[in-house]
Amino acid sequence: MTRFLKGTDRPLAEAYQLALLDLDGVVYRGKNPVEYAADSIRAAEAAGMTIEYTTNNSSRFQHVVADQLKGFGLDVEPWQVITSSVVAARMVAKALPAGARVQVLGAEHLRDEVTRNGLTIVDGPQDRPQAVIQGWYPDMTWQMMADAAFAVEAGATYFVTNRDLTIPRELGIAPGCGSMIRAVITATGVEPVASAGKPEAYMYDEARELNTAEGHDLVPKEASIAIGDRLDTDIEAGNRGDYDSLAVLTGVTNPTELMLAPSHLRPTFIAPDLRELGEAQPEPVRDESGTWECRKASAWFENGQVHVSDPTSMDGLRAAVCAAWEAADQGAQLSEATVPVFAIEA
């Protein structure tokens, strides 16, 4: 059964207690803030929403990220930053007895989190580690990867922080943590038993748990919303974990990708940016003729094409997304050539 975009009768910041925000492409791009993000987050917090920031980055300390966000005018405590190192170390600690020997292949942040969770870091396979945990580490050498492979071959349980194959850098796209993990997998024939990062939902689950450590009640899933710019990480993690989600257009995802998204990558809501946290969300409605309407905009599928009345508005995109998803799930072969081109006006 096709799952379509939903609506709310009150602003998202009031409809949900907890927002699980991605960072790059949502709050900032590299070193620069995303327009409207900080003001929108402050307004959401004033409305009673708790904010946690989730990132697959395993090398940056929480306080470093928090300081960057404070530089944008946000009031952020380090505990609100949920990195894949934080989640991975907790994941290993739950799987192994206290004090278990762990070989760490990763940055200092990952090593600190492993120690913080009561595990014992060992130097290499000669120390017979019970687990290996691998994160992104730009200073990784062949010998480090070989030692990880030797330990995994000897029976150590293999955990990873995330499986992102690439990472953007100023000069272009570079190998990410997942590319380095593939080297160990290829050498050993062993897949990691678990990954802490998105698109797994484990990060969102742990973020809700970590919120309780600050004296808050556990926020149920239905009162939590995952927010991100990437369908294949942020939104897929939400779908895997049964979280509602909001996809914003301030990062990598564009209107065409939204219309062509397969079922496991489809968000609950879409928005141009985080200002929509302060707005009720209109729900597209299908009439008897098969036309999808979202307030004054409409979209329909006819003769192999998705058509839209207004290719400049978010409501037009909302209607077109629903028309495209319905057509695709009924067997239509959609592509960039069969969906409308949008130019969303700010």
Predicted regions and their residues:
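Asp-based, Mg2+/Mn2+-dependent phosphohydrolase catalytic module
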Residues: 2-21, 28-31, 42-46, 66-79, ...
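Conserved phosphate-binding loops in N-terminal lobes of ATP-dependent enzymes
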Residues: 50
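Conserved phosphate/oxyanion-binding catalytic-loop motifs
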Residues: 57
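Polytopic endomembrane small-metabolite transporters, centered on the Drug/Metabolite Transporter
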Residues: 84-86
